[in-house]
From Swiss-Prot:
Monomer. The gene is aroA. This is 3-phosphoshikimate 1-carboxyvinyltransferase. It comes from the Bacteria. The keyword Transmembrane does not apply. HAMAP family: EPSP_synth. One of its GO terms (cellular component) is cytoplasm. It is an enzyme of class 2 (transferase). InterPro entries: Enolpyruvate_Tfrase_dom, Enolpyruvate_Tfrase_sf, EPSP_synthase, EPSP_synthase_CS, RNA3'P_cycl/enolpyr_Trfase_a/b. GO terms for molecular function: 3-phosphoshikimate 1-carboxyvinyltransferase activity. Keywords: Amino-acid biosynthesis, Aromatic amino acid biosynthesis, Cytoplasm, Transferase. Its EC number is 2.5.1.19. Belongs to the EPSP synthase family. It is found in: Cytoplasm.
Length: 446
């Protein structure tokens, strides 16, 4: 999809990548730090916040509902919260831009407050399904009117009329979704009694960690079958916090793969969050033979962090265990790029969720990789990729990024190992999650 404001960009065969970089703050943690700070009583401070379009949409929405949020000249953010139950009626629609995380989590917050909010977004976000969040929030008493989308999906624009007091519930997640889980837990903050989420497959647990750090009455139990039971007792005050946001592993993924596949590369990526529910890509790439060293392991704000040293490696194709998918769901597009240069066949399954991301990431990656000379077969729930054994790809194509930041960056990395340049039709969407992506890449090529 292109328009008058599209910014095409070509990426060519690269010199070895060398150096040390710090990537932007984790997107998931940045969203949640703003939301919970805005519900605390008092002033919270956040350092290292990701200042991409998605997180700024969350900041604007929390301001619109009464929180005092300001960025200082030194980059630290100060948030004066309104307290749980204190959200105010926004005057206008809340513009979510391209951010599915902002939309789904804020729907949860609004659902248990006595306010009404209209959510709007860009063309990409307005095609994404919201029914998975609407169902549990409706059971808690919220009245939600959504727009009809393709194949019966409930989409933006939508209106949430919150109910206070909301109705606590016990909800078993029908699919692995950290966003649905988080929406219910955030709704539970202002709901009397205990709200429970039953999670058969673990997903990223930033919400649970951060809710605990802010003083929410939250417990996590794992039953004999490995199912997680997350319970939150509502109407407890949240205490303001000082938060340091670690580097985003989903952003680090692009430079991890680039360093592995560009011959002669040796890159250190500082301060990467390695939450076990997010670290699947590192484990999969190591299993493929990737030389990834974890240095100076430490913990910051309840989150495990390390510096990653990554060196060019000969990768081997593997069959990726579908159980690992939730811990790297956003990293599969760039893993597919790595697989195109591996020796042998890489098989991925269980990735239905990729079809309802910012784009249908399975179809878009399969089409684009074929266009630049990769051998790819698309199945209903994954891709099968036969790698080149390290030989460069043909390249020489223009790729439709479909306004999807991770697609755009994945093909940028593919261009670094292609004989002819790979052109991304519009690089602008990268700003949603990684505003300085191109600058960091250029720095490693010096």
């Amino acid at each position: 999809m292109t328009d008058q404001t599209a910014t095409p960009r070509s990426f060519s065969a690269s010199v070895p990548l060398k150096g040390r970089i710090a990537i932007p703050g984790d997107k998931s943690i940045s969203h949640r730090s703003l939301m919970l700070s805005a519900l605390a009583v008092g002033e919270s401070r956040v350092a290292g916040l990701l200042e991409g379009h998605d997180v700024l949409a969350t900041a604007a929405a929390m301001r619109a509902m009464g929180a005092d949020i300001a960025r200082r000249d030194d980059g630290e953010w100060r948030i004066h919260g309104v307290g749980v139950g204190g959200l105010l009626q926004p005057r206008g629609a809340l513009d979510m831009g391209n951010s599915g995380t902002s939309t789904r989590l804020l729907m949860g917050l609004v659902a248990s407050h006595p306010i009404t909010a209209t959510f709007v977004g860009d063309a990409s976000l307005s095609g994404r399904p919201m029914g998975r969040v609407i169902d549990p929030l409706t059971q808690m008493g919220a009245d939600i009117s959504a727009s009809p989308g393709a194949r019966g999906a409930k989409t933006l624009p939508l209106m949430v009329r919150g109910l206070a007091p909301a109705i606590p519930l016990s909800y078993r997640l029908p699919m692995a979704s950290a966003q649905v889980k988080s929406a219910i837990l955030l709704a539970g903050l202002n709901t009397p009694g205990v709200t429970e989420v039953i999670e058969p497959v673990p997903t990223r647990d930033h919400s649970e960690r951060m809710l605990g750090a802010f003083g929410a009455d939250l417990t996590v139990d794992i039953d004999a079958g490995g199912t997680r039971h997350i319970r939150i007792r509502g109407e407890a005050d949240l205490k303001p916090q000082a938060i340091i946001v670690p580097g985003d592993p989903s952003s680090a993924a692009f430079f991890i793969v680039a360093a592995l596949i560009v011959p002669g590369s040796d890159v250190t990526i500082a301060n990467v969050g390695l939450n076990p529910t997010r670290a699947g890509l590192v484990e999969v790439l190591k299993a493929m033979g990737g030389d990834i060293e974890l240095l100076d392991r430490r913990e910051i704000g309840g989150e495990p962090v390390a510096d990653l040293r990554v060196r060019h490696s000969v990768l081997k194709g593997i069959e990726v265990d579908p159980a690992v998918a939730p811990s790297m769901i956003d990293e599969f597009p760039v893993l597919f790029v790595a697989a195109t240069l591996a020796e042998g066949r890489t098989v991925t399954t269980g990735l239905d969720e990729l079809r309802v991301k910012e784009s249908d990431r399975l179809a878009v990656m399969a089409t684009g990789l074929k266009a630049i000379g990769a051998r790819v077969e698309e199945s209903q729930d994954g891709l099968v990729i036969d790698g080149t054994g390290g030989d460069p790809l043909a390249g020489g194509a223009t790729i439709a990024g479909h306004l999807d930041h991770r697609i755009c960056m994945s093909f940028a990395i593919a261009g670094l190992v292609s004989k002819a340049p790979v052109t991304v039709d519009d690089i602008a969407p990268v700003a949603t999650s990684f505003p300085n992506f191109e600058a960091l890449l250029a720095g490693l090529q010096q």
